[in-house]
């Protein structure tokens, strides 16, 4: 059993890339003991300037763990994928060709209506060849996540021995405390999450935060049963030379953070994201969205989803990064086979024009998922 996925992506009119991956697995249960193994086969062609670790890894072990079910407590050790809440800080990185896995231990407990997860892990760093994925010797993650009805509470600790923010590199120890409220009432649904971060980095203290909101309403009386969605995110950034690092670290977030093909990550940003989802048929859905991005502080630049700086602040005076429109169509052709396509265009704003090249990015994606 498993899943295979192929995608073709086109950025502007010149760049084309094809990415394919397969994730078969074997899952053995003997009494209260479970053994699970999942290889990954991931290749990429045409990625410019070169395919990175999230694009290809050859053939390797994505997951391989043993699990013991003790009733109210489940213990797991080995290589595993993690998904906490909405994957704002810890996710499977689905979207890029190579999902994210961790090596370590996890315990899940049921305490009345609460679900408690404890974890101590290190991320897996994919290599360019086969069977060369390795446990990170620089990064570590530990913490606790409590899921209650319509409420999540969590603490996550993170260490990076060689973190880089701007021109400075050093040891980062960061603590994240978060709360999430979510649920539905009739045709309305909501998902609101806030995170505060503190710690130290290269002789500076850390003080960072984020607030994300999503409010949606279904309109079942209208044709195509539209759902109107409004998302807004505010993520802190750094201010120059004040002895405090204000740059938020999203740790290990989901790959499709702001949309199917967004080039901007959740650091030093203000984002507005209205959209509508339509049910064309039981097996066919369409979503259309618009995004606008601003820098939260002028003293910090913009980052990609993994947290790498992609444009420094320079001498720019503008906060406005740009706008994006996106449409995604998904067809569940069979219970096992899903086809989807995405079309997106990102138009640069004044900040990008003030700091370097600023061309419109046009993106087109085709994706096929087969679960067997």
Per-range role (PLM):
Residues 1, 82, 235:
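Hydrophobic pocket-lining residues within nucleotide cofactor-binding pockets
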Residues 1-79, 105-110, 182-191, 197, ...:
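Beta-barrel outer-membrane channel/assembly domains of diderm bacteria
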Residues 32, 71-75, 93-241, 279, ...:
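Signature for the C-terminal beta-barrel architecture of outer-membrane proteins
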Residues 42-44, 81-84, 124-125:
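Solvent-exposed loop/turn segments at secondary-structure junctions
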Residues 47, 87, 162-165:
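Short, solvent-exposed polar/charged micro-motifs at secondary-structure junctions
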Residues 51-53, 90-95:
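"Short basic amphipathic alpha-helical interaction patches in structured regions
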Residues 60-61, 90-91, 101:
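Short acidic (Asp/Glu) patches
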Residues 241-257:
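Acidic/polar loop-and-plug regions of large Gram-negative outer-membrane beta-barrel proteins
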